[in-house]
């Protein structure tokens, strides 16, 4: 668990120095927590008591508890102010979604990720190579990142070597993964009954299946004519295995130190029989290797150099033809066809083609492979200039990153078919003409470059740090240049920053920070590419005042506040185009002589160029308190308010359609957001027993103040005034009981005639009928929760310990859209057992959760409404670890080992939530999330 000096209340540590500063400031505070220096990257160390901005820190002790694929998955649920959510159960695609302080804008809310001072993708950064993760939240903390910092910054600092030492550390993890929520669908006989019930509800004269056929599905007597296939179990095995091995080498001499890491990962996926073909596998497996080298060199008394290198090779394998196996599983009923026929052909028929046979697709459609290659490099030289002026230094850094993705697809087709039944005679099915489709082919090959990214960064700075009696000062002048290019049209991006930052301290208790950043970007229009971002922040260490001396229970107490305006270059997708008139060229016919000629094109105006030359900007205010009380209780609280203005929005709502072309975008959007964050952490040791307990809770809220919304007939239709990502739909008030109930109710004009068992809606606008004008705001955001919290605790006795972290969300909504739950049976799709058990029938009218069955797309039922909406909040055990640290005295006898730890971990073992059928983080026709049991060993030589 988190150490009391390194854990959640690092979240309270507020950076008085930004991450790009290059100086160490020492504190003379008597209290260890307040005086502790924390490395936030690029050789920046700062004192907690000197900090004036809102930053939370996650240390390496916390990031190594999950045995996760990358650092992003390692910090799930951690870091005050950081929302992290899982979005996939497929190992190759496990990369969480992050937000800092919730939803803040209409055009983009993704934070900036920085690794060792350079913007970088974190999906290939392993937890073992990370020293700390800092979450920069307020204007003072993010100012020096210019246009890129408005949504907050996640700053990752990797490990470095140690002078005059040598250490080798090896970690081995073996994980067994299970699907957290394996979907359950009805069996073949139940499916046949459900289809017959749906046909009756739809008014069809004859059932879909005769009673003989329904009985045949249940008897199992005719497995090729009337099959009963569990497609989940036939396609996927019950578990997968992940192995992770890394070895790090830390050390150095008097003037050189190094940190090197080799990290290897392998996950073998869930496909059940992937090796039926010689020479290749169709499994959805994943292999990755990282090689990192961080070096520090003292070139002279006043000159130092740092070099960071990271190479990444990653490869993911999947079934061919871009087969979406889970989409097939969620669509195909168990009664469709057998996996294979008696003749050995793959199953398939005229109703359900063999190309949707998930077993055939997983084994006999070939395979695809993604190759990811990346190299990340940076070099920094720092020169102290005491001969010029004591405390003066200059620094330069260059960085170059290159990443590419190459996609190989080796696909093939296969023959599929099924026997048919012509009729039943004397209680036995009579065979008809067999159905055959598809064809057998060899592997075809195609190779393409899906993407590549190049990024170049250079910066140069001069900084000055000194103390004059009761006064201390640090000041920095810095220039940043960045170029990036991607595998796409008009993707080249240039950014520049010119920044000035000053930190002032008085009597080691009053602190003031000022920053001015002038940023430029080629994303913006000529004449408006540059903008100024000013910030100011201050802190007051009350615990050093004389009037606090007698309060022995107060070890450390500090108040702080910040305000700033952060400019951005955030634009809508392809936003650069909006600065120019948009034209289209099409064919045309015009009268010439005696006929019409069409062998020439015509060009017309398609969209008007914007006249908007403003920047989206974030005005941020933050106030907070940090404290250490009773010799071990660390506490932090932050409250914030932000206004985003000049957000680019479409002006289509302001102009009549008579304009005849697409309306321009203008910077008229305004969004307000506010909230608070609180952290507690308590550590204690009694004899040989150490224990700690802590918690974070964050609350966020947003409101759209302006977005150029088109006038609406009724106020319930207006989204302005509601939260960002607010859902709009109908309010369900039950089901129609019978025809008399329908006749007595207000007419529902939603595209289909209501019938018993259909959803009944509220007349929101009071006009006596239910139509599209009755939509209204329902639920909360479906993108990010408004409440996010965690609880962590741990206890250790003589090396034997237990750590656990729980994480939860609140005020969070979702909408069921999975085929087997939403529109089941429509288009011959399957139906989940949960829907079937909770469907409306005359007998279950009082307890039903879902509408009556239908084989047609019922427009009355299948729309966004509160019946399909669910409470997405959850409370999960993110990770638990039982470990044993071997006594050093025992290890000393080996004359080889310096440390050894044996552990067993559980990852995402259980969830308390409101969704019985799936997981609230990831639901729908996709890979379920995994639960993992991990056995591991860590040894240090």
Question: What function would you assign to each model-found segment?
Answer:
Residues 86, 100-104, 115, 137, ...:
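Flexible glycine-/small-residue-rich
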Residues 294-303, 308-313, 322, 329, ...:
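Extracellular/periplasmic, surface-exposed regions of secreted and cell-surface proteins
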Residues 2-4, 8-17, 21-38, 42-112, ...:
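Membrane-proximal, glycine/serine-rich, low-complexity loop/turn segments characteristic
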Residues 339-344, 360, 809-901, 906:
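Extracytoplasmic gating/loop element in the C-terminal half of outer-membrane beta-barrel translocons
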Residues 666-785, 796-798, 807-812, 816-818:
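Gram-negative outer-membrane beta-barrel transporters
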Residues 185-232, 332-362, 408-453, 585-608, ...:
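Flexible glycine-rich, low-complexity coil/linker segments exposed to the extracellular/periplasmic environment
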